[in-house]
Amino acid sequence: MPVVHVIDVESGNLQSLTNAIEHLGYEVQLVKSPKDFNISGTSRLILPGVGNYGHFVDNLFNRGFEKPIREYIESGKPIMGICVGLQALFAGSVESPKSTGLNYIDFKLSRFDDSEKPVPEIGWNSCIPSENLFFGLDPYKRYYFVHSFAAILNSEKKKNLENDGWKIAKAKYGSEEFIAAVNKNNIFATQFHPEKSGKAGLNVIENFLKQQSPPIPNYSAEEKELLMNDYSNYGLTRRIIACLDVRTNDQGDLVVTKGDQYDVREKSDGKGVRNLGKPVQLAQKYYQQGADEVTFLNITSFRDCPLKDTPMLEVLKQAAKTVFVPLTVGGGIKDIVDVDGTKIPALEVASLYFRSGADKVSIGTDAVYAAEKYYELGNRGDGTSPIETISKAYGAQAVVISVDPKRVYVNSQADTKNKVFETEYPGPNGEKYCWYQCTIKGGRESRDLGVWELTRACEALGAGEILLNCIDKDGSNSGYDLELIEHVKDAVKIPVIASSGAGVPEHFEEAFLKTRADACLGAGMFHRGEFTVNDVKEYLLEHGLKVRMDEE
């Protein structure tokens, strides 16, 4: 079995890349230090990276990898950079002004303009059609991008790069064109994550490993019309996420369940925990149905076992073997005391999840505590919250804030310190205003903190995405809370995932057309088999919304 070498500087989720390469029939050998790096014994090298530019390139240099990487490139053997692995080829980035890259490409990365679109870019974009695409990049396929900083192009920069021998695959986010992939001689790199881009991404990895550039398939005019990017949503497809609430039932089995206003027990039948299936099998099923992401919310956090034996780690490891789209895990991402009394910081907990196959971690209760502290300190963090420590190491895009709010009616802004708005749906006593109160501990405890205040604080502390639940809508199958979504979109510039209330495909369309939701999440309607993820996507496609279709 041919061997692929992967440089490991402990930057994010290498498990998924390893799984993708093994899925393609290759063996993976991780290169953890320069002394493990034998150029003559290496035929394919991959440099993956996630998170903060400076954190990654400084790590690369401090561990002594610069010289062997340069010698390997000089040898003419194939190398592939992924995400920050692509960015490391550049001179530097405004994200980390004091850090220097490998400087194979002489210009600096810059941040996307967030005045016109959410930043980070999180979602499925495409390469702009060109005659010079390479390694099977297909302008009618979608690839998974997750980044705030990019090699943003203008005509002069593009011309200079091409004059220097670089082939460029461009993508466009909002009005900004940037480098999606580059190729020169033996160097190939992608800004997107091919290991998280479904079958389309696996094809790109396979083409690199086989050093082949097959032609773009012959699509019919009708197929091109359906699949081509119309840039109606900044260039991204409408993202559909399948969510699995995981907990142990009364028999000790790990099951996927679903609440009704956060109550996961049956109304009859002895009040047992609703069992809607096994998490790994369901995740695989939703991936096959076309889910753009799968989220595991570990709703009991498995408090009675050592962290390293947490069942969720095994769930992630198994799911990541066959689910080649992003995986998010939530529950228990905080500073903990292990069963043996050892104190384990949130960053270490998150790192364990990332190494097991997670791409993002979701923080709930501790995000509320962090936001309260942020305001107590006069609108600043102190660097110790899980949001700050994890985003500093892995990047904002790795930190999702899971919010569990409920609607509170008031007569005017004077009734609360939290931001209110005038609602179309007056309260039981004719109240015209409302705010959304944050809860903790799975909705069991309310705090004097509004969703507006929470999300703004978390964005400032370094979070990259909001998973916006709604206790009032949970399990209702009556559609998302559209007012809540718009309220939070007014508050922050990071992407917002609409959650709670979806019962039919029309609810997804309604959220995408009537709000600025960046993604929509479904749970019960998928678990019960009433609709598949593909049913939702087909419906959206029929109604003129672009979605990712990942068929061979």
Swiss-Prot record:
Miscellaneous: Present with 11800 molecules/cell in log phase SD medium.
Residues engaged in binding L-glutamine: 83
Listed pathway(s): Amino-acid biosynthesis; L-histidine biosynthesis; L-histidine from 5-phospho-alpha-D-ribose 1-diphosphate: step 5/9
Swiss-Prot/TrEMBL keywords: Amino-acid biosynthesis, Glutamine amidotransferase, Histidine biosynthesis, Hydrolase, Lyase, Multifunctional enzyme, Stress response
PRFAR binding as annotated region, ranges: 364-365, 402-404, 474-475, 500-501, 523-524
Single Gene Ontology MF annotation: imidazoleglycerol-phosphate synthase activity
Gene3D superfamilies named among the record's database cross-references: 3.40.50.880, Aldolase class I
Name of the molecule in the record: Imidazole glycerol phosphate synthase hisHF
InterPro entries linked: Aldolase_TIM (IPR013785), Class_I_gatase-like (IPR029062), GATASE (IPR017926), His_biosynth (IPR006062), HisF (IPR004651), IGPS_HisA/HisF (IPR050064), IGPS_HisHF (IPR014640), Imidazole-glycPsynth_HisH (IPR010139)
Documented effect of changing residue 258 to A: No activity. Uncoupling of glutaminase activity from the cyclase activity
Similarity remark: In the C-terminal section; belongs to the HisA/HisF family.
Gene from which this protein is expressed: HIS7
Function: IGPS catalyzes the conversion of PRFAR and glutamine to IGP, AICAR and glutamate. The glutaminase domain produces the ammonia necessary for the cyclase domain to produce IGP and AICAR from PRFAR. The ammonia is channeled to the active site of the cyclase domain.
EC number: 4.3.2.10, 3.5.1.2
Lineage, uppermost ranks: Eukaryota, Fungi, Dikarya, Ascomycota, Saccharomycotina
